[in-house]
């Protein structure tokens, strides 16, 4: 595309932005007005993509990390020929619109990730670039680069102030993710005013210290943008391209001020902006007519690029049928199929033996990775304690790209966002691991995964007061309830080693949201199951009967995780007809319906046993009928902490007998 055409495209982006935000009476005009030239360069020339096929695998990915500037993206997608109509633009920020206030994955063709919470977009972009590097090492040959694309992101000062951006950028530099190119819209303005108030550091030096290539130019020089992007592509380091800009450019009433950030220009402001831009104030949603032919030509060129790749892919498939078979296995819907999982042999766990569910998880993960090479992930500096140091998962590094294990370092938030990016990219099934109590560090990324309904997996060990000596800073009590409170999240808390295998199967077959696998530090026994069909029951219903309690149980204990063993001991001690139910997944159990719940519960009175707060169990039992923990723990051996808190089998017996008196 010529510079003249890109100028016309930038003008059209500004026009659509002004009118869409004014019509909605809501939005953020500052960034789209200030960065329209960049969008014109990207979508007019730089990006390797195909608007007619937004899911083409080898496309470049663009992530608008500064998601509040969504009209920049929607306007560019509309002009480029994506299935985003002018009517969609006119319905910006309206209920049911394909152009919501912030970009939403799955809502708008061409939107690669849900963004808006600042810093997470660049972090997911790191995940995209990491996935590209892994897959390129696995599938490319000297003659066939079937995985060869770049990830671009646009950030502002707000993104770079967020800690998660620092975490992810540090990781990207360490791993030398050279296919990652980040544009920094440097306008020195945030909502509160000049960034002199809040952001005095030298960003360029900071990113150089991370191991990035740093380049500088003007947002309003097409030559700068094109040349700097070409320079970035030649370097094997991630690149930060700092583009000096003016927020709200072209709108005289707000240009260069914080007033441009997050409010419509108003009738007078719109009129003045259109005059300044050389537009007719009476004309709304203007698109330069000369763009029609230019953009149609560009769209045809993009389709031809995909056609050329398809030819390359078919030649590669013919020459390397084993690699093609691995490719097909990696790209099944959801990343893992039932038939693939059927080939995984469950490790042998001796009945009556005792081991921590985190240890069992490590054995299961090793078995899974030996069959599923696209299962990848890592830990936030807890590889051993999280039991994810499995022999079948080789480390990934700047020097060794074919590995599948990521040393994320002490960067929980970035880890989760990077896992989300890897999951969005496709071709991999990704997990991240840490102590359960530190899931609070990455909760916003878990929430975005839930909002996007992507099946990121999070392995959370050290799940209760039985952590012991590390004390209450490391003993989660409120965390189970907090995780379960997020819509679309599955929380799986297995009671023993065999349930841990089932938990991983459920997690990997789940496709409509993230999964948290919650695991114990302490040993728990592998117990006999009273129902031979317990595996299918727990997969379908999230819970199953561990102890029948006779033909007509007097009372049922609902328990999860390590408290299932506690409940079994209490049932035995009570000498009453007590049924024990293991609730592996409370969300599935509660969604199973009244009939299934009654069958599993047995129609008896209910007591709950769980080493966490009462919140979330109110529909099943009153607080006084539950053995729960509504207080923090203490430092000491786990069993002694439990005794001190009266969280014991004997305490549960007392509740049971009182309830049956």
Swiss-Prot record:
Annotated positions binding thiamine diphosphate: 68, 116-118, 158, 187, 261, 438
Keyword set includes Ribonucleoprotein: no
Residues marked Important for catalytic activity (site): 28, 261
Biological process, per Gene Ontology: pentose-phosphate shunt
Pfam families: Transket_pyr, Transketolase_C_1, Transketolase_N
CDD domains xrefs: TPP_PYR_DXS_TK_like, TPP_TK
GO cellular component: cytosol
Residue numbers annotated as active site: 412
EC number(s) per entry: 2.2.1.1
Residues involved in Mg(2+) binding: 157, 187, 189
PROSITE patterns membership: TRANSKETOLASE_1, TRANSKETOLASE_2
Protein family according to the UniProt entry: Belongs to the transketolase family.
UniProt name for this protein: Transketolase
Native source organism of the sequence: Treponema pallidum (strain Nichols)
Organism ancestry: Bacteria, Pseudomonadati, Spirochaetota, Spirochaetia, Spirochaetales
Recorded name of the encoding gene: tkt
């Amino acid at each position: 595309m010529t510079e003249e055409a890109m100028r016309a495209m930038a003008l059209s982006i500004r026009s659509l932005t002004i009118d869409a935000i004014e019509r909605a009476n809501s939005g953020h005009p500052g960034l789209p007005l200030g960065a329209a030239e960049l969008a014109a360069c990207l979508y007019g020339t730089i990006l390797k993509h195909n608007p007619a096929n937004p899911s083409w695998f080898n496309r470049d990915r663009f992530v608008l990390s500064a998601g509040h500037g969504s009209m920049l993206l929607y306007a560019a997608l509309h002009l480029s020929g994506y299935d985003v109509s002018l009517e969609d633009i006119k319905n910006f920020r309206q209920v049911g619109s394909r152009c919501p206030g912030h970009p939403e994955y799955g809502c708008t063709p061409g939107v690669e990730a849900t963004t808006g919470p600042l810093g997470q977009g660049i972090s997911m972009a790191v995940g995209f670039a990491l996935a590209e590097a892994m897959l390129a090492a696995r599938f490319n040959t000297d003659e066939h680069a079937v995985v060869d694309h770049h990830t671009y992101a646009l950030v502002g000062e707000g993104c770079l102030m967020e800690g998660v951006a620092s975490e992810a950028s540090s990781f990207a530099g360490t791993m030398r993710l050279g296919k990652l190119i980040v544009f920094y819209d440097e306008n020195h303005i945030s909502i509160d005013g000049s960034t002199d108030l809040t952001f005095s550091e030298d960003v360029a030096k900071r990113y150089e210290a991370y191991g990035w290539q740093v380049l500088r130019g003007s947002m309003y020089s097409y030559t700068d943008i094109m040349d700097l992007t070409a320079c970035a592509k030649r370097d094997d380091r991630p690149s930060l391209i700092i583009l000096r800009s003016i927020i709200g450019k072209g709108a005289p009433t707000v240009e260069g001020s914080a007033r441009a950030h997050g409010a419509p220009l108003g009738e007078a402001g719109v009129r003045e902006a259109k005059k300044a831009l050389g537009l007719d104030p009476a004309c709304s949603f203007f698109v330069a007519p000369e763009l029609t032919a230019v953009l149609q030509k560009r769209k045809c060129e993009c389709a031809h690029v995909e056609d050329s790749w398809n030819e390359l892919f078919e030649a590669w498939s013919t020459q390397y049928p084993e690699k093609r078979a691995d490719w097909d296995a990696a790209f099944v819907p959801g990343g893992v199929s039932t038939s693939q999982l059927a080939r995984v042999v469950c490790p042998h766990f001796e009945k009556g033996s005792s081991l921590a569910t985190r240890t069992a998880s490590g054995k299961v993960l090793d078995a899974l990775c030996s069959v599923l090479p696209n299962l990848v992930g890592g830990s936030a500096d807890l590889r051993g304690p999280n039991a994810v140091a499995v022999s079948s998962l080789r480390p990934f590094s700047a020097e060794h790209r074919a590995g599948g294990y990521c040393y994320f370092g002490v960067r929980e938030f970035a880890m989760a966002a990077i896992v989300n990016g890897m999951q969005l990219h496709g071709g991999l099934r990704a997990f991240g691991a840490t102590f359960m109590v530190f899931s609070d560090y990455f909760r916003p990324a878990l929430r975005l995964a839930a909002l996007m309904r992507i099946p990121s997996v999070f392995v959370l060990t050290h799940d209760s007061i039985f952590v012991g000596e590390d004390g209450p800073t490391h003993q989660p009590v409120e965390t189970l309830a907090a995780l379960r409170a997020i819509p679309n999240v599955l929380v799986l808390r297995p009671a023993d080693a065999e349930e841990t295998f089932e938990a991983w199967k459920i997690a990997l077959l789940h496709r409509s949201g993230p999964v948290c696998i919650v695991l114990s530090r302490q040993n728990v026994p592998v117990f006999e199951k009273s129902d031979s069909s317990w595996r299918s029951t727990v997969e379908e219903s999230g819970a199953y009967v561990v102890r029948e309690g006779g033909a007509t149980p007097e009372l049922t204990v609902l328990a999860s995780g390590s408290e299932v063993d506690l409940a079994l001991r209490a049932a035995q001690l009570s000498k009453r007809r007590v049924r024990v139910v293991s609730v592996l997944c409370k969300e599935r159990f509660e969604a199973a319906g009244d009939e299934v719940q009654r069958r599993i519960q047995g129609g008896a009175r209910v007591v709950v046993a769980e080493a966490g707060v009462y919140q979330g169990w109110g529909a099943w039992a009153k607080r006084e009928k539950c053995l729960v923990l509504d207080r923090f723990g203490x430092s000491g051996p786990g069993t002694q902490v439990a005794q001190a808190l009266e969280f014991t089998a004997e305490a549960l017996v007392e509740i049971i007998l009182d309830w049956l008196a």
